[in-house]
Design a protein with these regions (language model features):
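Membrane-embedded helix bundles of polyisoprenyl
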Residues: 1-35, 39-74, 85-105, 110, ...
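Membrane-water interface regions at transmembrane-helix termini and the short interhelical loops
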Residues: 4-8, 74-79, 153-154, 204-205
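Transmembrane alpha-helices and membrane-interface helical segments
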Residues: 25-33, 65-73, 149-153, 193-213
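Membrane-interfacial segments
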Residues: 35, 74-78, 108, 112, ...
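Contiguous transmembrane helix-bundle modules in multi-pass membrane proteins
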Residues: 38, 57, 161-172, 180, ...
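Juxtamembrane/interfacial segments around transmembrane helices
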Residues: 47-53, 71-72, 93-98, 115, ...
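Short, well-ordered loop/turn and helix-capping segments at boundaries between secondary-structure elements
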Residues: 72-76, 101, 176-180, 198-202
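Periplasmic/ER-lumenal interhelical loops and adjacent helix-loop junctions
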Residues: 82-191, 230-233
Length: 233
C-alpha cells in the first residue's frame, strides 16, 4: 500500500487526498472487530476522525466501509442487526461532528455553479481509460495486473460482487460525481477504493484457478484501446 505511486504523489502535492487513509484502515479493522465482539464504538471513533481530517472524502470512505460491512454480513450470514448497528454508528458520527460538517454541507449545497456545469449525459457515458485505477496523477496508482485480477474475480462466485462494484465505479463517471458530493466527476475520489482493490486482488489470488474464455479476454484487453498513456500500463 505505502509503495503506491498515488500515495507518494498526493503526500507531496495535496496531502488532504490521502491523510484520511490511516483512519479508513482503522475503521475497516473496527468492522472486523465488530463481528467478533459486536461493539461498534471503534467505528464511531475512527469514522469521526475521517470526517475531522478530510470531510470532503468522508462520504466516499463511508461508502467503502458500507461495502466492506455488507461483505462481512454475507460471510457471517447475518444482516438485520449488524446493519442497524452500522446505521447507529453513522448517526453517531454525524452527531459528533455536526458542528464541523453542517456548515460545510450548507456551503457545498449552495455550490450550484459546479453542479450545473456537469451534464447528465456525460455522467452516464462510461469511460474505459481506467485513469482512476492505473498510474495517473489522480488515480489509485496500480498496474494493469490489478485490472486483470479484478476481471478474473467476476468468474468466481465468492469475488464476483466486489469485482462488479469496482468495475462499475471505475467505468461510470456518475459514481465519481456522487462520491464527490455532486460537485464534479473527477477520478481522484476513487483513491478511497485502494483498500477494497487490494483485498479483492488477494481474494482472487487465494484461489487462482481460471479458464480463459472469450468474454474474460475481451474485458481484459478492452481498456487497452482507450488508455491515453499506454507506457504506464
Amino acid at each position: 500500500f505505502v509503495l503506491l505511486s498515488s500515495i507518494f504523489f498526493q503526500f507531496h502535492k495535496q496531502v488532504m487526498f490521502v491523510n484520511y487513509m490511516p483512519f479508513l484502515f482503522l475503521m475497516l479493522r473496527s468492522i472486523d472487530h465488530y463481528f467478533i465482539d459486536h461493539h461498534f464504538t471503534g467505528i464511531i471513533i475512527w469514522g469521526s476522525c475521517i470526517v475531522l481530517h478530510s470531510y470532503f472524502y468522508c462520504i466516499a470512505c463511508f461508502i467503502v466501509c458500507f461495502i466492506y460491512f455488507v461483505m462481512q454480513c454475507a460471510n457471517h450470514k447475518e444482516y438485520k442487526k449488524p446493519l442497524f448497528h452500522l446505521l447507529i454508528a453513522y448517526v453517531g458520527i454525524v452527531l459528533l461532528t455536526a458542528i464541523y460538517t453542517i456548515p460545510t454541507l450548507y456551503v457545498i449545497a449552495g455550490g450550484s455553479k459546479s453542479v450545473s456545469s456537469t451534464h447528465l449525459l456525460d455522467l452516464l457515458m462510461p469511460t474505459f481509460s481506467l485513469k482512476g485505477l492505473l498510474y495517473n496523477n489522480y488515480g489509485c496508482g496500480f498496474t494493469y495486473l490489478i485490472w486483470i485480477l479484478i476481471v478474473c474475480g467476476l468468474y468466481k462466485k465468492k469475488t464476483r460482487l466486489l469485482s462488479l462494484i469496482i468495475i462499475i465505479s471505475m467505468f461510470c463517471p456518475l459514481i465519481c460525481f456522487i462520491m464527490n458530493g455532486f460537485l464534479y466527476a473527477r477520478s481522484k475520489i476513487l483513491i478511497v477504493f485502494i483498500p477494497l482493490i487490494i483485498l479483492q486482488a488477494g481474494l482472487v489470488l487465494e484461489d487462482f484457478t481460471f479458464r480463459i474464455n472469450y468474454s474474460m479476454l475481451i474485458l481484459i484487453i478492452l481498456p487497452l484501446f482507450f488508455i491515453t498513456q499506454p507506457y504506464l500500463v
